Amino acid sequence: MEIVKTEIEGVVILEPRVFRDARGYFFESFSVREFEEKVAHTTFVQDNESCSSYGVIRGLHFQKPPFTQAKLVRVIKGAVLDVSVDLRKGSPTYGKHVAVELTEDNHRQLFIPHGFAHGFAVLSDEVLFQYKCDNYYAPQSEGGILWNDPDLQIDWRIPADKVVLSEKDTRHPLLKDYISEFE
């Protein structure tokens, strides 16, 4: 596994070694030993999976302290633009984002540490998306930032008339109206 740093400290891309032959391909998608050596010491306790169609944007979500979550995300089928926004108070990259294309062909994974809002846009007809979390889902601690906050300047790569959102994701505050609880 190769680790690729992004412009925001702590957010890293994992690129596995993929072995291909006439039968197809094989790669190790996760190893605790290698992850802890190269990325972070964390214990994932919950795996989630979602299936979405083209134009769906999920996010930008987070869980408030003390229920914060680090995530390791990947695409099984299809393609997404995966976005992480730094919400850590005092961070030199506060309010900045990383956007990475994750696809069934590139097999990339993205590690998002505590203190980030996370979301993704579906770029393919359909996507099967998986993520590991190091804390359990806690509905009482749900939070979010508005997906199209103009200050974030995220290019979701979906035409406005094709965007599909949940009702909840249309009601999140702008970053400037959010008081960060993340250190």
Where are the language model's segments positioned?
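Short beta-strand His + acidic residue motifs that chelate non-heme Fe in jelly-roll/DSBH
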Residues: 110, 118-123
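Non-catalytic, conserved peripheral segments adjacent to functional cores
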Residues: 1-105, 124-126, 131-133, 138-183
